[in-house]
């Protein structure tokens, strides 16, 4: 089984004994400045103690008042999930307590298979359901990209088509009942989809941007919205890379739906799935039961983590 999550001390079912009058949820953040919302719907500007930055959009936190408009975040409550990325130099928390990741992609501008596969891997590692959203599906360039995405449907990842000029209603049943996050490259239409889903709430986003001194750069930080009483949506900044250095190489096969059933079936328990005889992974790729490209991806990520 996969190793213990590096943030496992903060992932569990929230304690029902926590009092509600001193708790809030982070709905936006930039650096060490945050916007939090209490259970009664009141929003506050928030700072942290001792320059802490280990908070994420979606975190439920304990707060202490500073004045009528400001509070201090004391700590986060136990997390149900944590989505983050890590390269060789730094860790970037993306969102906490999400139950569903929607990877927004489109044929234009040029989509990244590398980013898609890495985001899917991160979702598997975090125990978060992943959905692929094919936006701008009415573009003529879409057909070839859709054909490539159909492979991921065979792995169990739904592919939902949306069109920028429509109202994103095809997404609403998928989002319902989940704490969702939209993630993808810049230019894929995440914010446009968010605005379509929010409708009349869109005009309120300027207040948060002003509070964070972010001006017009409304996609430089993650932001959480309530779509209804049971559904939340986080719009996140566009990204080009998704570091996976927080994962353990030995755990990787568990995060591949196309290979996890083969774990333990190789002749050697320490098989690297390369040149060893009796490798179940290699056999699956050679017979067409699994994709050779996916095996190469697994090998590449393994090398990256061990390098």
From Swiss-Prot:
Organism of origin: Neisseria gonorrhoeae (strain NCCP11945)
A single GO molecular function term of this UniProt record: rRNA binding
Origin: domain of life: Bacteria
Annotated positions binding Zn(2+): 266, 271, 273, 279
Cofactors: Zn(2+)
UniProt similarity note: Belongs to the TRAFAC class YlqF/YawG GTPase family. RsgA subfamily.
Span of domain CP-type G: 85-242
Subcellular location, record wording: Cytoplasm
Binding site for GTP: 135-138, 184-192
Gene Ontology CC terms, in alphabetical order: cytoplasm
Name of the protein in its database record: Small ribosomal subunit biogenesis GTPase RsgA
Gene name of the encoded protein: rsgA
Cofactor stoichiometry and binding remark: Binds 1 zinc ion per subunit.
Keywords for this protein: Cytoplasm, GTP-binding, Hydrolase, Metal-binding, Nucleotide-binding, Ribosome biogenesis, RNA-binding, rRNA-binding, Zinc
